[in-house]
């Protein structure tokens, strides 16, 4: 069986956890392929809500194997805390597999992330301060420490000593911060190694074998398309590639194994942190969207910026990711509006464009061009068939589909597992 990819089609927080959980019942493996604990998924099952940061949402399905791929950067302390929290709630985490090739977030990564962000002042990007960027930086610089190094204490110490020789110079002499002691880190990470060793595996080989045997593999991205380090609103982006092109690399499988790419997209738009946001609503309407939609970060708790649906970035996401399907979430949040504006293009320096601007300078100056669509006032959270939605809601979905250029195959009308209207089967 081929693999399928699930990605965020906006600035993250689109509802990927809900989508992954829904599809999890039909897949054998769910693989996280990039990012770190700087993002979060929320999955609601009945009266229970689960916030996941590193562990793939598939862990909540007993017949599904959750995998953390080689493209992820892992803070082992955070991972173990998340595992313990799930275990305490009766969730079996023994099936979790971790790629030996994934990189570790170290104490010096967190320290440098926090102090650098403070040093930048008003020019700061708005990172979570969890060390993700510095960890990816060391990976590219070939000075990183990987999960497999936990299996060899001698190699781990050798790599750590080499890393801290430089990092401590920066921390103490540039930022006037305390040096990080090798022995303390070795002791801390040895305890992590003891607990994580049973979960470490050659996950790329395992997944390729599973695909050859006809198993279904779901590749789950974190964050969103507009936060991609190459294709996002740089420099206000994450340090990895959430887009579909990285899914195979970050999971350790060949790209020809993938035949479907599903983009998760909200019925409106949100963003966390700094950076351009053409449709942002800095008014009472924006506050209302935030309140009704519960728009606060799973990882940071920060209030999300809110705005109307942006068809320009939707088209961009379809193009950059090669999306075959859209999964529209939070349609229920828009109930109660007389009309719902949708951004169909931008005005930049007096000129109209319907496509993503080539430069970030242009994007910063983009003014949204709206069309007003009829709204609806009915509560749609209990609707179980797309055909039973109010006509205006159906028309809204159809319009977004046409503007984005990809079929809407599922619609979320609430946070629960059962609150999803499937239009086209995704698996």
Curated annotation (Swiss-Prot):
Keyword Cell division: no
Keyword terms: Cytoplasm, GTP-binding, Ligase, Magnesium, Metal-binding, Nucleotide-binding, Purine biosynthesis
Enzyme Commission number(s) of this protein: 6.3.4.4
InterPro entries per the UniProt record, alphabetical: Adenylosuccin_syn_GTP-bd, Adenylosuccin_syn_Lys_AS, Adenylosuccinate_synth_dom1, Adenylosuccinate_synth_dom2, Adenylosuccinate_synth_dom3, Adenylosuccinate_synthetase, P-loop_NTPase
GO biological process: 'de novo' AMP biosynthetic process; IMP metabolic process
Record-level GO cellular component terms: cytoplasm
Name of the protein in its database record: Adenylosuccinate synthetase
Organism: Parafrankia sp. (strain EAN1pec)
């Amino acid at each position: 069986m081929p693999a399928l990819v699930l990605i965020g089609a906006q600035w993250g927080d689109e509802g990927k956890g809900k989508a992954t959980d829904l599809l999890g019942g039909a897949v054998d493996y769910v693989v996280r392929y990039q990012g770190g604990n700087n993002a979060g998924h929320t999955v609601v099952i009945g009266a229970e809500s689960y916030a996941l940061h590193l562990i793939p949402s598939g862990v909540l399905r007993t017949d599904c194997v959750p995998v953390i791929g080689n493209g992820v950067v892992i803070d082992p302390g955070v991972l173990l805390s998340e595992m313990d929290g799930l275990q305490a709630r009766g969730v079996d985490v023994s099936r979790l597999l971790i790629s030996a090739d994934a990189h570790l977030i170290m104490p010096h990564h967190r320290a440098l992330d926090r102090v650098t962000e403070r040093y930048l002042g008003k020019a700061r990007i708005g990172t979570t301060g969890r060390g993700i960027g510095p960890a990816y930086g060391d990976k590219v610089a070939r000075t990183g420490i990987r999960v497999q190094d936990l299996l060899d204490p001698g190699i781990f110490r050798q790599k750590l000593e080499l890393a801290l020789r430089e990092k401590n110079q920066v921390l103490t002499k540039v930022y006037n911060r305390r040096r990080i002691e090798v022995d303390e880190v070795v002791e801390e990470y040895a305890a992590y190694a003891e607990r994580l060793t049973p979960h470490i595996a050659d996950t790329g080989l395992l997944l390729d074998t599973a695909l050859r045997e006809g198993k279904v593999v779901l590749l789950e991205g974190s964050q969103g398309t507009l936060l991609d380090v190459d294709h996002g609103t740089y420099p206000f982006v994450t340090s990895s590639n959430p887009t579909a092109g990285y899914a195979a690399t970050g999971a350790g499988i060949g790209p020809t194994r993938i035949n479907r790419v599903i983009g998760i997209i909200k019925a409106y738009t949100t963003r966390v942190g700094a950076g351009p946001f053409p449709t942002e609503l800095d008014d009472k309407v924006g506050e209302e969207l935030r309140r009704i939609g519960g728009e606060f970060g799973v990882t940071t708790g920060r209030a999300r910026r809110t705005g109307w649906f942006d068809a320009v970035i939707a088209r961009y996401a379809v193009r950059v990711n090669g999306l075959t399907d859209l999964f529209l979430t939070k349609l229920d949040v828009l109930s109660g509006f007389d009309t719902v504006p949708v951004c169909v293009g931008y005005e930049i320096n007096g000129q109209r464009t319907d496509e993503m601007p080539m430069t970030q300078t242009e994007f910063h100056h983009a003014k949204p061009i709206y069309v007003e669509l009829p709204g609806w006032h009915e509560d749609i959270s209990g609707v179980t068939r797309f055909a039973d939605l109010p006509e205006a809601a159906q028309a809204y979905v159809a319009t977004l589909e046409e503007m984005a250029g990809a079929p809407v195959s599922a619609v979320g009308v609430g946070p629960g597992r059962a609150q999803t209207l499937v239009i086209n089967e995704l698996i």
